Amino acid sequence: LGNTYSYEEVDSFYERVKKDLGGKPFTIAAELKYDGLSISLIYEEGILVRAVTRGDGQVGDDVTANVRTIRSIPLRLQGEGYPRELEVRGEILLPFSEFDRINAERSEAGLPLFANPRNAASGTLKQLDPAIVASRRLDAFFYYVPAQPDMPDSHYERLMQCKAWGLKVSHAIELCHSLSEVHHFLDHWD
């Protein structure tokens, strides 16, 4: 996984990967980055058992009760073939329409407004009352599944498998076979 912020960084990343692989063919899963609250979900036998924020990188907050109120996160995976234990990582987001609605309600009540959707999502997920969390209509997108024996080798295939199990994956993801395809993806979303 690599984050890039300019075409020059993309080109440099692509050439570095090409060199590291000794010229062997490879693909890149190009996708947009979401700016939300990082979350890690654990499913056991297809059932959501734990949701933890990234916290300080070592220790996060257990927000399982609140995550269970987010409609876009399945409490039980769909279909079959999922591993006994599955970890997926993603971002919890507050859509702009919800952000505006919540701030309008806060303004009417004389409460301080949230500065931005990311801070509002973070504050919402840490609420002690899951009913408040449910009322704010958070959303989630998943972007990473650690490699494991029961899953496909490629990042892209793992995400598509998770999508088949009902986890929300960005619609803005494309499997690119060349640097020009990566540029085309960037041009489309720029």
PLM-predicted stretches and their roles:
Residues 1-190:
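RNA/tRNA-interacting regions in translation and RNA-turnover enzymes
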